[in-house]
Amino acid sequence: MQKKIILIAEIGENHLGKINYAKKMIRYVKHSRADYVKFQSYNEKCLTKDDPEYEWFKKVSLSDKDHYDLQNYSKKQKIKFMSSPFSLERAEFLCESLKMKEIKVASAKMTDLRLLRYLNKKCNKGIKSQFLKNYKSMLEFVNIN
């Protein structure tokens, strides 16, 4: 059986917090023949105010409404919508409210065992990053699956 390579176009936070930019990027991605367009899901609750990048992440975080809009827009453009949650709360939103069954785990969250266990139960397909921090974290990750 031949495996198909899955192409994920990472928009991440490059939309600069502007939904019209995000939609424009989705249109461009559609023409690249990518299978998925991927964003990042976090909110102010995921951040601490003493984080040097707090203002940046606050600016580029997507609201729940933004997620719904971008998911629907992606569907209209015939490209699959995906996002990487940066907290259990955001994972619950993606899985339960948006009904997402495919989640890409951010490399920064590969050692968040609570998040990984939740996603393992709720997702049909978890797409994992290959950038593991060390051998121990790799073993913990593999043992969850």
What name fits each language-model region?
Residues 35-64:
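Glycine-rich, proline-tolerant flexible connector loops at the mouths of alpha/beta enzymes
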Residues 33, 95-103, 120-126, 143-145:
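Glycine-enriched alpha-helix->loop->beta-strand junction motifs that scaffold or abut catalytic
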Residues 1-12:
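N-terminal amphipathic alpha-helix/helix-capping segment at the start of soluble metabolic enzymes
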Residues 10, 29, 94:
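Conserved, mostly hydrophobic/aromatic
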Residues 23-42, 97-99:
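Catalytic domains of carbohydrate-active enzymes, especially glycoside hydrolases
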Residues 14-28, 64-65:
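Glycine-rich anion/phosphate-binding loops
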Residues 57-62, 79-87, 91, 101-112, ...:
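Catalytic beta/alpha-barrel core
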Residues 8-9, 34-46, 80-85:
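Short beta-strand segments at enzyme active-site cores
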